[in-house]
Each structure stands twice: as structure tokens, then as C-alpha cells.
Amino acid sequence: MTKIVFIGAGSVVFAKNLLFDILSFPALREVTISLMDVDSRKLGMIEKLARRMVAQEKMGAEIEATLNRRDALRGADFIVTMFQIGGLAAFEPDINIPLKYGVKQAVGDTLGPGGVFRFLRTAPVLKSIAEDMAELCPDALWINYVNPMAMNCWYINRVSAIKNVGLCHSVQGTSAMLAERIGAPMDEISFVCAGINHMAWFLEYKWNGEDAYPLIREKCKDPEVYTLDVARIEILKAFGYYVTESSHHMSEYVPYFRKSEEWIERIHRDANWNDQKVYDGMVLQLYRDQEGEFERRVERLLSKEHLELTRSDEYGAFIIHSVVAGDPTVIHGNVENKGLITNLPEGCCVEVPCLVDQNGIRPTPVGSLPVQLAALNLTNINVQALAVEAAITADREYVYQAIMMDPLTSAVLTLPEIRSMVSEMFEAENEWLPQFK
């Protein structure tokens, strides 16, 4: 029986969606799902929810729950990671210390001071998981949803030989958004998308085989469209291609927007994310708001006479189904660059189309990106490379240098100011950074 392990199972919406996504495939209705989390209360509640779903849908799946990661991993075929080290207590200084210095992050989980420190907290756990997998399930496929995606996957590939792929929903989300914007049914759209996580590019976007970029550019002139997606449309105008991640995210990865109150206001004025108003530190506030909601959200679901279950567009379950059943599918995955994008560094983490079937994940070589797009990607890859080196060597100087290279931080602060800010972040997050003690 196929065994699928969730590490960090205590996420209500994500665990519920991914559980049902997996069980919605007939070939996966009798798998073993092992839920693992360090929080016994959350784990118990997610286990109840999982058992309720299996019973309601009359499936033959077996549900296990454990606090012991090694027990969960033993004999596994697929590992899905979805956790955050340090929780809200660690996320607060990621946002608030840079904000004190004038570095205004909207999300702070991918690049910049927040992204680098989130990665440094996560790296020791990733290494430990990789070591356990090498011993207990060396042939398993590791499906990672933990951010910062590019740094995490690059690090995993540096410290282990475990098969892995990093997944995000920005490609499918933006491709659908563009189709809706131009009035096209999604089943009539084809595209080529490649780059790095949160900064991949729609190199082609076609409607019934015809280039749809002229339509996209025309729609972007509409003031109502523009105010919802300011940063991405400005990047389209300047560099010629549409980027995958949202404007509030994208505005953190380049030096052009978040150093000016006028531009920050433009980006945030009418934008929303998951039906929430966008503002500085918005995701941190969402975490605060949700901190006490976990139990109530699960109880609300369990109290319903019938759970409404629909398949999401996340890639995770499609990958598992394709490997188990042999039905091929195409995803956009974050994988090691082995000649896939020739003008980005070998070994870095790139996001490219991948064919998935019974043989596993096979990334598609893309060739060279347009030079201006590769140049933008490299500004982020430089930060990632130094952060990964810091995690491997435990040398603090690489952390300072990574954040000195960050496009947003370097647009706002001097080198001495960056050093002071990073030192303060080290002090605030010391308990989650054992490798630097």
C-alpha cells in the first residue's frame, strides 16, 4: 500500500485540501496517510478531520497520526512538508526589525531579511529530514511546500541526494488570472513559463495558438486592471514579460517600488490577496489573526453534517497520482538547474515545466531566458546563493552579505545600516538558529 507522509500536518485549510485532493483519485483511495506534527493538539484535530473525510467518502484509506517523525517516515513513498519553524514568535522579528530600519516587506517569506532568516531557521530541520529519509525511505519523493522555496530546495540538493520537488501555486494562479482578464476559457490557453520561484516568466502565452500578449498588454492599460496589479504591470512594461507572483510579492524582489511611499500606496491601494487588503506586514497580521482560530475552524468543519470537498489546483496530489497510476501530467516544479535554464547558474533552484509519470519527475530543458529576465532572476539568485552558503558553513558573514545583496534592502539602507539590522535579527532569533551558536 502506498504510504504518504504529511510533515507539519497542523494546517487546517492546506491539510484538508491536500488530503481530499489525494483521496479524490480512485487509484489513491486506499493509501496510508501518516500525519506528523510537533503540536499534539493540532495533530489530533487534523486526524479527526481526516478520518471524517475518509468515512464520509467511503474510502479505504488508512489514517495514522504521530508526533515521531521517524515513525512516520519509515517505509514512506511520498513525503509532503508544510511547516514553519518558530511560528508567529519567529515571524515577528522577520518583519518588525527590518520595518524599524525602513525595509517595508508585505510578506517577507521568500527573499529579503525575512526570507533569509526564515530559511536559516528552516535549514537544520530540512537537513534532519533528509538524513532520516536517507535511512528510512531513501527512494521516496519529497514534495516541499515550505517557503522560501528556492533557498530550501537549493539547500536540500546541496546536503542530500533525496529526490525532491518544490511546489507553488503561482503559475497556475496567474495563468488562470490572465485567461480571465482577456476573456479566454482556460482550456483554450497554452503557455511556456520558466524562471525561479515567485519570479518565473510567461515566455509564451497563447489563446488557441495565437499570441495573447497583445491582448494582455491592452487590458493592462485599463485603470481598473492596473490598480489591482501595479508592480507586475510596470515590470511587464519595462521588461516585456508577465511574472508569476502577485504584485505585493514582486514588489519585494526588485528595488523599484518599496523605497517610495507613493509607489507603496499605488501597489496597495486597490490590491487584495485572498480577499484581504494588502499593506506592509500584511501576512504577519494574518498570522496574528489566525493564531487562535485553529481549533474553532476545525470544530466548525467537524460540526457540519456534510463536508464540502472539491479538488484544488495544487500540484501535489497530481504528482502522487501520476507516479502511482502512471497517468502523465505536466506541472511547474522547483528543481535543481542541471542545464535546464542555460543562462542561470548550474545547481541553483529553477521553476520549469516538468513531465510526471511512473518514472517520476522529469524537468523540461528551457534553454536561455531573454537576457533581461535572467538578469532580474540573478539579482534574487545571488541572495539565495549566499544564504545557502551561510546555512552550510554556519558563517554569519554570508548572512550579512546575502542581505546586503538583497534588491529591496540595498535600495533603502547603507551597508552599516544593513549590518546593524542583521545583527539585531540574529539576537532576536537566536533560539531558532542553533547552527550559528
Which residues make up each language-model segment?
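N-terminal Rossmann-like dinucleotide-binding module
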Residues: 2-30
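NAD(P)-binding Rossmann-fold cofactor-contacting core
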Residues: 27-51
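Short glycine-rich, flexible loops that bind phosphorylated cofactors or substrates
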Residues: 31, 87-88
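Short acidic low-complexity segments
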Residues: 62-75
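Redox-cofactor binding/interface segments in oxidoreductases and associated redox assembly factors
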Residues: 74, 80-81, 144
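Rossmann-fold NAD(P)-binding glycine/threonine-rich loop
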Residues: 89-158
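Internal, well-ordered domain-core segments that constitute the primary functional module
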Residues: 129-202, 206
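Long, compositionally biased stretches enriched for glycine and/or charged residues
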Residues: 183-437
